[in-house]
Amino acid sequence: MNRLPSSASALAYSAHALNLIEKRTLDHEEMKALNREVIEYFKEHVNPGFLEYRKSVTAGGDYGAVEWQAGGLNTLVDTQGQEFIDCLGGFGIFNVGHRNPVVVSAVQNQLAKQPLHSQELLDPLRAMLAKTLAALTPGKLKYSFFCNSGTESVEAALKLAKAYQSPRGKFTFIATSGAFHGKSLGALSATAKSTFRKPFMPLLPGFRHVPFGNIEAMRTALSECKKTGDDVAAVILEPIQGEGGVILPPPGYLTAVRKLCDEFGALMILDEVQTGMGRTGKMFACEHENVQPDILCLAKALGGGVMPIGATIATEEVFSVLFDNPFLHTTTFGGNPLACAAALATINVLLEQNLPAQAEQKGDMLLDGFRQLAREYPDLVQEARGKGMLMAIEFVDNEIGYNFASEMFRQRVLVAGTLNNAKTIRIEPPLTLTIEQCEQVIKAARKALAAMRVSVEEA
C-alpha cells in the first residue's frame, strides 16, 4: 500500500528530534522512550540488519546501548548513564579523543563566520589545510583533493591514477588479498571480500589481487601484466590491513613494493585512511620504512572525530593532470570550511601533544598485556598483534570473538570485530587514552577471558 507524504508528521518528528538535541540529560522515562524509538526507527527506516549486528556485541542479547553523548576524551555514555571506555574509536576516527576541545572550538569559531563555501570565491581554510598537509606528508606529496570519506579519497586516487597513466597505455590496478578500500564501485573493485563484492558484480575491469605481504607474488603479477600488455597503472595497498584483521606485512615489504613500482613504472597508492594521523606510532604508517607514495589517501581521524573529511594527496607530477580542468573530479562539500577547520585543529593537537609517540608507548603497553593474556588463554586466543594503537586479538574461532566483544561490553569496554576477518577483535582506542585506562582495559580483557573459559568448561 502506497503511503502518502505527510508534512505534518515530518514537522512533528523534526521538532521532537530538535528538542532531544537541546537536552543534556534524560530522565528515566525519556530514556526508555528514546530507546524504544531508536530501535523502532532503525527497524522500519534505517536497516533492521544493524539491530542484529549490535546484538552480537552487547550483553544479555539486548539490542544494545543507545549512544547518547561522549563522556570524557576517551569514553562514551549511553542513555542509561553507563560509561564505556572506547577501544573501538569509531573504526579509527577518534585519534584525538571525543569532542576534543581544540577541534570543537575551531569548528564553532568557523561556524560563527561561514559554515560552507560559496563554490565561487576562494575559501582560505582549504588552501591552508592543503599547505599544512604538503608540509606534513612524506616525500614530494604536494597537492590535495578534499572529500568527505575514506572511500571517496580512494575513488579520487583511482581516477587520478587513471588520468595520469591512460596516455601511457597503463590501465591495470593491483590490490591485495584481505584489503579493504571502501564500498563505492571503484573502491570496491580494490576491496577483497567476496561478501561485499558479489552482489555488485561485475565490478570495474582491470583489477587484480595478490597475497598481502608476499613481495614475490607482487613481482610476478607486475611482470605477467607487462608481458601480456596489461601494464599496471598503480598498486594500491594499506601499510597495515585494518579490516583484514590488523595484518602487518613482513619488515621491508613496503620498501620492496616501492622499488617494484619504480621498476615497472606503476604508481604507488597508499591507503592510510585507518593507519594515518598518528595511529601506528608515526604520523603515517609508511614512515616506519621511510616509503614515499605517489598518492596518499586519508580520512577518518583527519576530522578529529568532529567533522567528516577525506583527502587525496599526490605529487605535482601526478596531480598536474587536473590542472587544465580542475572540474574533472569535484564534490560539493569536499574541503568545506567546517571540515577544514576540524582537520587543521586535529593536526595541531597531534603535533602539539606528540600523540604519535604516545600511541607508540601506550600501544606497546596494551599489546604486551594482550600477548600475556594470549599465553594464559591459548585455548581461546590465537594471537595478539598490532602497531601503535592499532591492535587485534585473534581468537580460535568466530564465536569466541563475538563472545569476547559481549564480555568486554559487560566490563564497560567497547570493542568490535573487523569487517574482513570475523575471528579478530579490533582494539583501536583514542591516542589520548590514559595509562590508567590502558590498565583498566587489560584487566577487563582478563576478566572477560576468565568468564569465557568458565562458560566453555560448563558447556
UniProtKB/Swiss-Prot annotation:
Which cofactors go with this protein? pyridoxal 5'-phosphate
Q: Which CDD domains match?
A: OAT_like
PROSITE patterns noted in UniProt: AA_TRANSFER_CLASS_3 (PS00600)
| Record field: catalytic activity | an alkane-alpha,omega-diamine + 2-oxoglutarate = an omega-aminoaldehyde + L-glutamate; putrescine + 2-oxoglutarate = 1-pyrroline + L-glutamate + H2O; cadaverine + 2-oxoglutarate = 5-aminopentanal + L-glutamate
The PTM N6-(pyridoxal phosphate)lysine maps to: 300
UniProt keyword terms in alphabetical order: Aminotransferase, Pyridoxal phosphate, Transferase
* GO biological process terms, semicolon-separated: L-lysine catabolic process; putrescine catabolic process
Q: By its UniProt entry, which SUPFAM superfamilies does this protein fall under?
A: PLP-dependent transferases
What pathway is it annotated to? Amine and polyamine degradation; putrescine degradation; 4-aminobutanal from putrescine (transaminase route): step 1/1
Keyword match Ligase: no
Question: What is any Pfam family matched here?
Answer: Aminotran_3
| GO molecular function annotations of the record | diamine transaminase activity; identical protein binding; putrescine--2-oxoglutarate transaminase activity; pyridoxal phosphate binding
Is Transferase a UniProt keyword of this protein? Answer: yes
Q: What is its EC number?
A: 2.6.1.82, 2.6.1.29
Catalytic EC class = transferase
Give me the residues that bind pyridoxal 5'-phosphate, please.
Answer: 150-151, 274, 332
Q: What is this protein's function?
A: Catalyzes the aminotransferase reaction from putrescine to 2-oxoglutarate, leading to glutamate and 4-aminobutanal, which spontaneously cyclizes to form 1-pyrroline. This is the first step in one of two pathways for putrescine degradation, where putrescine is converted into 4-aminobutanoate (gamma-aminobutyrate or GABA) via 4-aminobutanal. Also functions as a cadaverine transaminase in a a L-lysine degradation pathway to succinate that proceeds via cadaverine, glutarate and L-2-hydroxyglutarate.
> So what family is this one in?
Belongs to the class-III pyridoxal-phosphate-dependent aminotransferase family. Putrescine aminotransferase subfamily.
NCBIfam families tied to this protein: PRK11522.1, putres_am_tran
Task: Check the record and name the HAMAP family matching this protein.
Answer: Putres_aminotrans_3
Q: What is this protein called?
A: Putrescine aminotransferase
Name the source organism. Escherichia coli O6:K15:H31 (strain 536 / UPEC)
